[in-house]
Amino acid sequence: LVHTLFKWVPPEVHFGDHPEWYSLAGDKRVPKRQLCFTNVGLRTALTKAVLTRIGEADPGGMYSVSAMDWTGAFCDCKPCRALVAREGTPGAPLYDYLAALGPQVAKRYPKARISTLAYRKGQSEPPPRTIRLPDNVVIIFAPIDDNFAAPIEDPSNADTLRNLENWPRATSNLWVWYYPNTYGPALPMGNLHRLAKDFRLFKRIGVKGYYIEQDAPGVYDSRRLADLQTWLITRLMWNPALDVDALIADYTDHHYGPAAPMIRQYIAALESATGAMQTRMRWKASTGQHRFLTPEFLLGCQRLLDAAQETVAGDARFLTRVKQARMSLDLACILRWDRLAAAGDVPFTKQQVITRYWDTYTAAVRSRALPTRHDALLSALSDSLKWYTVMTPLKPLPPPLDAIPAQHVRQFTPETAFLYRGVPKIVEDPAAASGIAVAMAPSLAKPSYAPAELPPNVLNMGFYDELTRRQQHAYAGKDDSITTGGYRLYPLGRTVLSSQCYVWFDWSWEVQFHDVSGLYNPDEAGKQWDVYASIRFEGPAYSPQTPAKQNRFYVDRVVFVAAER
């Protein structure tokens, strides 16, 4: 269990009486950030809670005291900021507290240990300069901000490497929380040599323990070559000096039989293509960030796996495993179908790939997942595949964008949009550009940070660059009135892309188009784009005459137009 601060000191219990225990955000104490570790009362209450729990549970166990899982500074009060300045890490207040907690725990429960996460570069990943954590405090280094397409020793992860190498100066108990895969769609990528290099690095630095977060999409159903990957991890944790190519050969020979050579060619293609990417891949990677999934690459890999299946067609056991190895590739073809179809000469239809993917996934879930999970897993996939089945060719853009040559325009439809917490929904809409749209009830109440001059019922939308933390806001209904009825283009302004960016909607940011990052080209890093969102509105907040009783907005596409043409 991690991200536990509010388990120990719940704000719903204590904030009313003790707001000073919680983070200062600007000039206001807030209950939804972190704790104020320099507050004496908070330290006393937290220590009491930890000691009480150890006494009630297992005096020899390990107990997590780790920050909540959201970004931002821990606390803006002067004592906390002074610790940050002294120690050179935003996590300094937490580490200062843990340095004091450790001896108190050791005195009463000498076999107990306290763990915390070194997590996020803007929070606790960098180690402190002068604080030395006691021996009963375990630091679990969790590089969530990494480039997931490259090992930690790659130049793109230089900050992570520096932080990891410096941690042994501050602790004798360094563990790693390792992320083998990205979240988001379970697409294929080459990461086997990455993890082998990382485990050799961990051995050299002196890492003493691991937690492998091997629950990203695809692992439980054998997508992403997850069985091979899991086996490699278990072998490399014991002996990171083992030859990873020899391990892959050993596993594939036994697992795929006569199809093993083709599977190894597929793995080699993934490793080479992923390693050649010049852009970062974040932990929640969109389809667009998998830049190597070009039509040529996808079709070449499909030919390899066609040959693999033909080779083992007479052996049900090996054939099942080859089909499972193919699932992520089939998903990539579904998500990239427009580009595949545009390339021409595709020897299969979209529906054929969808059917094969569904059949293989269903069989894998029923044979591998807990029976109590079958219905939920299959229902989720059925819902997502439905949209690829019902989507229609894109309708023409409305004026004035219809006059712009196609090579200067890129469009993004909502089938791969990130829908936070499942609150927004993808729906069929005959009026939408591709027959589907993302629908959501808007947050009509303006938050406290909203510009005061905004009129009521505007829709907040914008662009966010995760690398530079640059935000760009726009407001549908600010300069001209929102209209109900059909879809209409609303401008988001001019922007520059990065390899990790997205377009978002509503004050809650619960609708996010991450695939726009796939437009980024490092050779054209400063290229400017004019951005538009195609939206329709309904409900009494927008028109008293509307027949719709609920307020909703629908986004059917986001359009990028090159500023220089």
Can you say where each PLM-predicted feature lies in the sequence?
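Catalytic-core regions of glycoside hydrolase
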Residues: 1-44, 48-245, 295-302, 306-315, ...
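Plant-skewed but cross-kingdom recognition/interaction modules and surfaces
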Residues: 2-9, 443-444, 449-451, 480-482, ...
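Residues that line or immediately flank small-molecule/substrate-binding pockets and catalytic motifs
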Residues: 67, 214, 539, 557, ...
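Catalytic domains of carbohydrate-active enzymes that cleave complex glycans
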Residues: 233-457, 466-475, 488, 551-556, ...
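Extracellular carbohydrate recognition and processing domains
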Residues: 460-524
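Extracellular beta-strand elements of beta-rich domains used
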Residues: 492, 514-519, 533-535, 556-560
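Exposed beta-strand face motif in extracellular beta-rich ectodomains
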Residues: 501, 529-531
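Short beta-strand-plus-loop segments that form exposed binding edges in beta-rich domains
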Residues: 504-512, 534-549
